[in-house]
Amino acid sequence: YTRTEQYIGSWLAKRGKRDDIILASKIAGPSRGNDGQDYIRGGSRFTRAQIHAACDASLARLHTDYLDLYQLHWPERRVNYFGTLGLNNLDDPADLTPIAETVAALDELVQAGKIRSYGLSNETPWGVMTHLHESALSGKTRAVSVQNPYNLLNRSYEVGLAEISLREHIGLLAYSPLAFGLLSGKYRRLPWHQDWRIAKYSRFTRYTKAQGFAAVERYAAVAEAAGISLAQLALAFVTSRPFVTSNIIGATSLEQLAENIASADITLSDDTLAAINAIHAEISNPCP
């Protein structure tokens, strides 16, 4: 907690040239797990006071006076994400910070020059449209992006959110484009090393389903036929989608980083895209 910002802030302070980069950070919402997050602002909410306090703290840690993008890490209300299906026990609106208050607070940060824009994350179609509606009603700054998972094993964003991205000009910042590393191809071989993330984080069970592994083998064959790595196939597909405005890559080595970056120069052929869609039609969203 906070260390990533501290590391980047230390690097920025030594390097300078702040205007040469696009810098983003997030404010956490309330935890729905068993670990709790009361240590974050005494219980993380999206109230005006907490948004201002969290942003000021991030700016201090990052050694900068503005953020290019400030995101709500996940909704304050209860929603489905990380593989959860079925939605029961909706929160009472009286127990939640009004989205209008959240929108107004973020607009205040924009007007103060502390952030240049703000975005949403792990959001639903209802949540995105409600944020945009509140902005339109009040004339406040609107959200510019949604950071949600999107990859060959989880194309659920296409069901309701892709149209919103295109029609409302609120682009997808696609995270987990390699599906927790599954689409890197590394986890095709057994046994898994105990330090590999898929073994360490057992709570992310949606990535260890038989259908997911079956789909990976099919996509690996498509990549081989196209003469590229499985990771490059997966990343190039995400980048090619018209509603995607940023593909959030990750790497644990310089070799992986080079492989991922090279995917930006790959254009998938019509035959390759057809093969991808044929697999998706048979094994749809095995890791939602």
List PLM regions with ranges.
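Active-site groove signature of glycoside hydrolases
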Residues: 60-83
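Short, acidic/polar
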Residues: 47-61, 99, 103, 128-132
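Active-site mouth loops of central-metabolism enzymes
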Residues: 37-52, 89-97
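Glycine-rich, aromatic-flanked loop segments that form ligand/cofactor-binding clefts
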Residues: 16-28, 170-176, 181
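Beta/alpha (TIM)-barrel catalytic core signal, keyed to glycine-rich beta->alpha loops juxtaposed to Asp/Glu
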Residues: 75-278
